[in-house]
Design a protein with these regions (language model features):
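N-terminal strand-loop-strand
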Residues: 1-30, 57, 61
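Residue-level marker of intrinsically disordered, low-complexity segments enriched
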Residues: 15-16, 47, 85, 130
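A generic structural signal for ordered alpha-helices
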Residues: 23, 27, 89-92, 103, ...
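Charged phosphate-binding loop/patch that engages nucleotide di/tri-phosphates or the phosphate backbone
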Residues: 113-133
Length: 133
């Protein structure tokens, strides 16, 4: 099981995402990772966001979730206003010119046009985000 999280800024216009370049391919990744033995799925998602992006997410920030093919995607609305993101943790250590990680705030409506992993149902994503606008 993989724990991922869509982190939305305070305007609910932008989402934190990681642009990847690997072996000449460009794609995007929803921040997240594996669930460790001592934690539940939600704790794993919160930890991964802290490790990868340096963002502090509270349980109270999380307002919904969906499950897609062995992946749990949490949705968190934050008080962040698109502050600069820096890749951290294992991803920073593994980063080099042929395998790079570039965290960014992206207008969430653009996600439908991009190759994003892990795969998720964009229409369901849009419905969930639209409910809090």
């Amino acid at each position: 099981m993989r724990a991922s999280m869509f982190v939305l800024d305070q305007t609910v216009r932008y989402v934190a995402i990681i642009k990847r370049y690997k072996d000449g391919r460009k794609y995007y990744v929803v921040p997240g990772g594996k669930v460790e033995v001592h934690e539940n799925i939600q704790q794993a998602a919160i930890r991964e966001i802290a490790e990868e992006l340096g963002l502090a997410i509270e349980q109270s920030d999380i307002f919904d979730s969906i499950i897609e093919k062995g992946n749990v995607f949490y949705f968190a609305k934050t008080n962040y206003s698109c502050l600069p993101l820096k890749i951290q943790g294992e991803e920073k250590e593994r980063s080099h010119p042929h395998n790079s990680y570039e965290p960014m705030w992206l207008e969430w409506k653009q996600l439908s046009k991009l190759m994003v992993f892990p795969k998720y149902d964009y229409l369901q994503f849009e419905e969930i985000v639209s409910e809090i606008l």
